[in-house]
């Protein structure tokens, strides 16, 4: 199945933002429209418009698959490269070094919503955000900014229901539990993070595993500051409590990065009394909405993450059906 199927059309677009350029892909149903539409917001790091990352193998990104499914359901979509991702990353980062913030990510999303609304076949009053992981924070912040083009609703896939730093530590704690001296290594990690949050040099202990040292170094890279400190305390739950448009929260039970209980429960408490917030916990969906057949107890990051974009990976059917049904009910 390709984006060039007879029932849909795909076009590449670009637009300026400050002294940088953003690239995106619009996929639309065939015909004159007008259509409801979705802007997709990628997760953390160098994740691109397709929800692929140069840090992980494979090119079978979930956002590209979602765009095809949305078009077949009569919904247009725009997915875009964050300015620090995709083929323009090096060019854009010459301008953005030290200037990446939560606000700069919000500016990117606002510009993408404007670019999508500017397409003649899109219904400006029926634009939704479909966001993954860190992207859910930007989608929530956008809706709370009294933006010029408010969203009709939000689909939040794997939102962190705890501060991002707490979620990251929980992931590391799970890995530390499986290795000798895990508790001692976790204490060294905590000490480095405490220095980071205090604005001091992190100086991670050389005893920490290479992967953990790389994570810590990425937070302290000049290009990522002050964004990394802002992100580390960001939490979707208090933001969700303030949103007044329909929201679908999706956390797969096979997600090993965001936990459907530990993150889902704070989000459910935050949404208490909000009749327009719906929760979905698909039995077999992973962090990027792909189907995972193995039992949750057998899943570990070293094996799971490299499979996110494998050629044979596909969207979880139950999750996809529910998302499309929710969008249909709100368009």
Model-assigned labels for residue ranges:
Residues 115-121, 125-175:
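Primarily recognizes the serine-hydrolase "nucleophile elbow" in alpha/beta-hydrolase
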Residues 2-33:
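N-terminal cap/lid segment of alpha/beta-hydrolase-fold proteins
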Residues 243, 249-251:
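Short beta-strand/loop motif that positions the catalytic acidic residue
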Residues 245, 256-270:
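Short alpha-helix in the alpha/beta-hydrolase fold that links the catalytic acid
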Residues 288-289, 295-331:
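Catalytic active-site module of serine/aspartate enzymes centered on a nucleophile-bearing elbow/loop
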Residues 97-119:
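Alpha/beta-hydrolase active-site loop
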Residues 31-34, 38-69:
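Short, surface-exposed "cap/lid" segments of acyl-processing enzymes
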Residues 149, 155-239:
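Accessory cap/linker subdomain of secreted extracellular hydrolases
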